[in-house]
């Protein structure tokens, strides 16, 4: 076995020749001599055969990493206006590694390339797109994507086009849907937000995916905002929109009736009926808590269609979500509600919030007046003494 293939300390032309020799030694169809057309032609030919590294069993991932690192160091030295095809070709090659250990090396190489490109370079988008693809392959998506705000910040200096962001959001949703449904749901909502009134009708498939992802996510309970998204509005009158409306504002019996009439549709969307029931019970509890400061266990049994021995475990599960603040009285077989998140937040809720804030303001004004009165009395008493 040869020693580590390190090229970074050499001049660019020398690096290119050593890379040619190394790749030819692995069986690549490339000459050992430098191109007479210059470094860009050298790099074009080197990138064209660099995936031969992924078929070689005589070099460690660390050695392959050194080779790819050398290629990256040459790429970033090429002027941006002449490097686009080279970067796109290199990114494509990095998706070819089959073995997990080598795919991780490719991920590192793409990250180096992404990090070393100017933040104003439009090519960073293309590198990042391939970065996500490879991250999915090695189950390391969380290393390159932590949230929509972080993503926007990365491209703040050179925002991708609307179409590019839609393509990226679709990829991220596909990557996240099985491992992080909550984040996948947020990505899909962001995707739908990129559509305008003019093109919302073309977002049918994205809108349906967004709804299904949100319904399937066990941690997404505030579904009302989806109804205001333009692409979702275009689905009004269709079964998927009707199902969303049930989850937004109806109770468990409405869902059970919908499932009874449209069982095949629900199953065809990949939704789990038992998980849907579990979610609808929690949403129904939230709705009951909005108008009831206390509820008996028997009331919960009837409303949520659960057995007597299931009531206490259910309440505990509700409290774990922190959507409802409550106290369970096992002796009296009641639950006392302190507060709950509203399933919908429309004009009545805004009015309620306004009234509450005005009440606080009035109380604080009264407290301040009382303090001023006491303070004035103390000052007057002190002056008399």
UniProtKB/Swiss-Prot annotation:
Pfam families: eIF3m_C_helix (PF18005), PCI (PF01399)
Major localization class: cytoplasm
Entry keyword set: Cytoplasm, Initiation factor, Protein biosynthesis
SMART domains hit by this protein: PINT
Compartment annotation: Cytoplasm
InterPro entries: ARM-type_fold, COPS7/eIF3m, eIF3m, eIF3m_C_helix, PCI_dom, WH_DNA-bd_sf
Cystine crosslinks: none
Keyword Cytoplasm appears in the UniProt entry: yes
Cellular component terms per the entry's GO annotation: eukaryotic 43S preinitiation complex; eukaryotic 48S preinitiation complex; eukaryotic translation initiation factor 3 complex; eukaryotic translation initiation factor 3 complex, eIF3m
Record note on quaternary structure: Component of the eukaryotic translation initiation factor 3 (eIF-3) complex.
Function field: Component of the eukaryotic translation initiation factor 3 (eIF-3) complex, which is involved in protein synthesis of a specialized repertoire of mRNAs and, together with other initiation factors, stimulates binding of mRNA and methionyl-tRNAi to the 40S ribosome. The eIF-3 complex specifically targets and initiates translation of a subset of mRNAs involved in cell proliferation.
Family: Belongs to the eIF-3 subunit M family.
Descriptive protein name: Eukaryotic translation initiation factor 3 subunit M
Organism annotation: Anopheles gambiae
């Amino acid at each position: 076995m040869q020693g580590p293939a390190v090229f970074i300390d050499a001049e660019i032309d020398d690096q290119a020749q050593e890379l040619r020799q190394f790749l030819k030694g692995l069986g690549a169809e490339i000459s050992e001599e430098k191109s007479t057309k210059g470094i860009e032609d050298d790099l074009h030919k080197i990138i064209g055969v660099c995936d031969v590294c992924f078929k070689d069993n005589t070099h460690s991932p660390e050695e392959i990493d050194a080779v790819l690192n050398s290629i990256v160091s040459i790429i970033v030295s090429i002027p941006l206006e002449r490097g686009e095809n080279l970067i796109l070709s290199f990114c494509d090659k990095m998706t070819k590694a089959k073995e997990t250990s080598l795919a991780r090396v490719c991920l590192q190489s793409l990250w180096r390339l992404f990090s070393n490109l100017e933040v104003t370079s439009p090519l960073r988008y293309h590198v990042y797109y391939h970065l996500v693809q490879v991250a999915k392959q090695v189950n390391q998506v969380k290393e390159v994507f932590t949230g929509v705000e972080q993503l926007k910040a990365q491209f703040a200096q050179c925002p991708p086009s609307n179409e590019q962001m839609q393509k990226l959001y679709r990829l991220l949703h596909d990557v996240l849907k099985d491992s992080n449904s909550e984040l996948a749901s947020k990505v899909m909502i962001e995707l739908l937000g990129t559509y305008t009134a003019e093109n919302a009708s073309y977002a049918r498939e994205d809108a349906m995916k967004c709804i299904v992802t949100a319904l399937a996510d066990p941690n997404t309970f505030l579904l009302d905002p989806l109804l205001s998204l333009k692409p979702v509005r275009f689905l009004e009158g269709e079964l998927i929109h009707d199902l969303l409306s049930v989850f937004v504002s109806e109770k468990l019996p409405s869902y059970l009736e919908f499932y009874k009439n449209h069982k095949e549709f629900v199953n065809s969307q990949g939704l789990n009926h038992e998980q849907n029931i579990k979610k609808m019970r929690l949403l129904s509890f939230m709705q009951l808590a909005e108008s009831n400061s206390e509820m008996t266990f028997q009331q919960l049994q009837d409303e949520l269609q659960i057995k007597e021995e299931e009531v206490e475990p259910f309440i505990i599960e509700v409290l774990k979500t922190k959507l409802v603040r409550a106290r369970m009285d096992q002796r009296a077989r009641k639950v006392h509600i302190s507060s709950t998140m509203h399933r919908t937040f429309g004009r009545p809720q805004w009015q309620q919030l306004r009234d509450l804030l005005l009440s606080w303001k009035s109380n604080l004004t009264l407290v301040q007046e009382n303090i001023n009165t006491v303070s004035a009395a103390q000052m007057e008493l002190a002056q008399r003494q």
